[in-house]
């Protein structure tokens, strides 16, 4: 999924994010938008307004099998809970300064 935003394109690939193996992959964000900012924007697009139709229970960064994931535990308006995995490995590598 590519979403055009003012200063570039948000590039997201992968699966539904229900497991690390099917993680939502943040490949690229527009200038000035962090991976976490992109993730929050996507959560709002999928679930609606934060604090109204969903709330964030917990967010953490985890390392699994050499990949880096942002995990979000959200509580939806009906009381159900959902955990989403965002793979930010490629984004972090893009943002890392070049090594000499």
What do these predicted ranges mean?
Residues 1-42:
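N-terminal trafficking/processing presequences and adjacent post-cleavage segments
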Residues 46-55:
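Short secondary-structure junctions
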Residues 57-100:
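Short, compact, well-ordered microdomains
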Residues 6, 45-46, 79:
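Low-complexity, intrinsically disordered/propeptide-like segments
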